[in-house]
C-alpha cells in the first residue's frame, strides 16, 4: 500500500511541476527560428532577402509589455527587409484600455523594415477589429484586407504580397486578394499571408503562389515528444506544424508569441520566424 501511495505522490509532483513549467517557463524564453527558403522564382534583385514573420501575440494574455519590447528589439537586431504579422494581435477575452492602444501603436511602430511591414487579421481580432486596424495603420503596417501590394526591385524584379482576412469569421475574399495574378504574369515571387493555415489548399488549388505564411495553430501549444500537438484549433487541423511543402508552394506556420484558450506552452516556446529567401540555382 505504501508503494502505491509513493507512486501517487510522485505522479502528483510530476504533474504539478509540469503545469508550473508550462505556465511560467514554457511561455517565456523567446526563440528565433531561422529557415532558408529556395525558389527559382526569386528575382536577382531580392536574392537573400530577409523576412521576419511573427504571429498570435494575444496581447494581455500571459504576455507582458516587457516581452513585447524584447521581441521588437530582437526583430530590429536582424535588420529585416520585410516584416509580416499574421493575426491575433489582441486576445478576444482581453480588456483593452486607451493606454494599451497607445503602447501597442508606439512599440510596434519601432519595428524597422527596409521595404515594408504587413499585417492581416486573425480570428481573435474581430472582437476589436476597428481598434486593431487602427493600431496596424498607426504603427506603420500595411493592413492587407483581402488586398495586395507589390514591392519593386531596382532591376524590374517584383515581389507580390497578398493578405487574406480571417477564414474563421468568413471574411476571406480570395478573388480580391489574388485575382491580379491571373492577368499579370510578370510577377516573380508571390507571397500570401493568411491567419488560418488549413486555407492554404484553397489558395493553391486556384492560384500559383510560392510562399504562404500563417499562424493560428501555435504549432500545437501543448506538445509531447514523439506524439506532437495535443490540440489544434479549427482551421488548423490538417496543417499546424512548422512547415509543409504542398505541390510547389512552401507553407510556414509560426508557433506564435502568446497563448490562447489556456495560458500554457509545453515543448513549444514562443518564437518568431526568420526566412532568408534565396534564388535557387538551376543547372
Task: Tell where the protein language model's regions lie, with residue ranges.
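Membrane-embedded segments
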Residues: 45-144
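Catalytic metal-binding/acid-base residues of hydrolase active sites
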Residues: 58, 90, 124-125, 148-149, ...
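Active-site-proximal beta-strand elements of phosphoester/diester hydrolases
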Residues: 48-58, 157-167, 191-194, 250-255
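N-terminal membrane-anchoring alpha-helices
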Residues: 1-45
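Extended recognition/assembly regions associated with phosphoester-bond processing machinery
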Residues: 19-22, 33-38, 180-193, 197-199, ...
Amino acid at each position: 500500500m505504501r508503494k502505491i501511495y509513493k507512486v501517487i505522490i510522485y505522479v502528483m509532483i510530476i504533474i504539478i511541476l509540469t503545469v508550473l513549467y508550462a505556465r511560467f517557463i514554457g511561455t517565456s524564453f523567446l526563440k528565433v527560428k531561422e529557415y532558408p527558403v529556395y525558389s527559382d522564382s526569386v528575382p536577382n534583385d531580392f536574392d537573400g532577402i530577409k523576412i521576419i514573420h511573427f504571429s498570435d501575440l494575444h496581447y494581455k494574455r500571459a504576455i507582458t509589455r516587457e516581452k513585447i519590447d524584447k521581441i521588437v528589439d530582437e526583430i530590429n537586431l536582424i535588420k529585416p527587409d520585410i516584416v509580416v504579422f499574421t493575426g491575433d494581435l489582441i486576445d478576444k477575452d482581453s480588456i483593452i484600455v486607451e493606454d494599451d492602444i497607445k503602447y501597442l501603436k508606439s512599440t510596434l511602430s519601432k519595428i524597422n523594415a527596409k521595404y515594408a511591414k504587413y499585417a492581416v487579421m486573425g480570428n481573435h481580432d474581430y472582437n476589436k477589429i476597428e481598434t486593431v486596424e487602427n493600431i496596424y495603420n498607426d504603427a506603420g503596417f500595411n493592413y492587407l484586407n483581402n488586398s495586395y501590394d507589390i514591392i519593386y526591385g531596382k532591376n524590374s524584379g517584383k515581389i507580390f504580397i497578398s493578405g487574406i482576412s480571417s477564414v474563421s469569421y468568413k471574411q476571406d475574399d480570395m478573388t480580391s486578394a489574388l485575382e491580379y495574378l491571373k492577368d499579370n504574369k510578370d510577377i516573380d515571387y508571390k507571397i500570401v499571408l493568411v491567419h488560418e493555415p488549413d486555407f492554404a489548399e484553397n489558395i493553391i488549388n486556384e492560384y500559383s503562389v510560392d510562399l504562404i505564411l500563417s499562424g493560428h495553430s501555435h504549432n500545437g501549444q501543448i506538445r509531447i515528444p514523439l506524439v506532437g500537438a495535443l490540440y489544434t484549433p479549427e482551421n488548423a487541423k490538417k496543417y499546424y506544424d512548422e512547415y509543409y511543402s504542398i505541390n510547389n508552394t512552401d507553407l510556414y506556420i509560426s508557433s506564435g508569441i502568446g497563448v490562447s484558450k489556456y495560458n500554457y506552452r509545453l515543448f513549444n516556446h514562443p518564437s518568431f520566424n526568420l526566412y532568408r529567401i534565396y534564388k535557387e540555382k538551376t543547372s
